[in-house]
């Protein structure tokens, strides 16, 4: 008989709307003794069945729902179906944009909580972020090896969120032979070098693909300041689009070295590109004091808030950096600014940038709202999947 998790009265509403998380404070009792990652059934307080998911005893999210179909068993065939569905959902995008790098599985938004899989040419990179995902590792590797026989499979489960599940970090080759790093992927006709072993996240920020192309519309014959540039891909797009000058800024010398490589891989001269290993906050203040200005500024900072307690501080950080950036823009200049903090609502982020403009004594117009690329879908019952927010603002 299946292990059963009974919820407290009234706590079934989110599951009835197909949200895939059950928090520890929603649980009334447990029938059985589930092991970490084991499949459990979740029922309402009156006993009616709600969903079937993975047990995470050390997490605040104690059950992540695999399925809301009572007839669907969680077995090898289940994961095969979900992986195939995820690939089908990307096929049109791959054909349209000629992608060789894309997100294959976007965790909860693809019905596979805790499982992220990115494809970089012939390398699949997996992040397994929950006990349920961890338990099914071998099955996932077998299925991926069958469905993608030409691909190596590498694990990058080295993120802090695993600690909340009571899991240790795991990295390493799971299947096949890893090619020499970096791997070269292609998007929108541009080649990008990706190091899946040492790079951020799974190696690269695939979610900004569409926004890189949008940024390129504003840069011809313009001066561009690319902040928190990582491997310089906003600057790379700008170079190909005819920017007059580009400054790529990051604290990582390794990232900047890859930014140089990206220019070379695309056969582009970097005579008009400056690579600046610096703290962005300090550099922007210095440039303001020196009276330096730019036509286009990209702000793509790391996550400022990992939890609700950090949100107020994140708001102050976003306001400060956007205020200084706006002070550095020439009249008619364009700011592309982003937040990758899932806890930051899009409307609040826009208000922060508007308030920053007031403090900077600049009039701005919001031209576009931006989000993550379409291979990072947002499940209709999982608003948390909408994490990347961006704005394009013109300053006067």
Swiss-Prot record:
Q: What EC number(s) does its UniProt record assign? A: 2.1.1.191
InterPro entries given for it? PUA (IPR002478), PUA-like_sf (IPR015947), PUA_sf (IPR036974), RLMI (IPR023542), RlmI-like_PUA (IPR041532), SAM-dep_methyl-trfase (IPR019614), SAM-dependent_MTases_sf (IPR029063)
Its chief place of residence is: cytoplasm
Ordered alphabetically, the record's keywords are:
Cytoplasm, Methyltransferase, RNA-binding, rRNA processing, S-adenosyl-L-methionine, Transferase
Name by which UniProt lists this protein: Ribosomal RNA large subunit methyltransferase I
Question: GO MF annotations for this entry?
Answer: RNA binding; rRNA (cytosine) methyltransferase activity
Q: What protein family does this chain belong to?
A: Belongs to the methyltransferase superfamily. RlmI family.
Catalytic activity reads:
cytidine(1962) in 23S rRNA + S-adenosyl-L-methionine = 5-methylcytidine(1962) in 23S rRNA + S-adenosyl-L-homocysteine + H(+)
Q: What does this protein do?
A: Specifically methylates the cytosine at position 1962 (m5C1962) of 23S rRNA.
Where in or outside the cell it occurs: the entry states:
Cytoplasm
The source's domain of life comes to: Bacteria
Q: What is the lineage of its organism?
A: Bacteria, Pseudomonadati, Pseudomonadota, Gammaproteobacteria, Alteromonadales
Gene name, please? rlmI
Which PROSITE patterns does the record match to this protein?
Answer: PUA
The residues covered by the PUA domain are 2-79
Recorded hits in HAMAP family, A to Z, give: 23SrRNA_methyltr_I
Asked whether the keyword NADP is assigned, the reply is no
Q: GO CC annotation: what is one?
A: cytoplasm
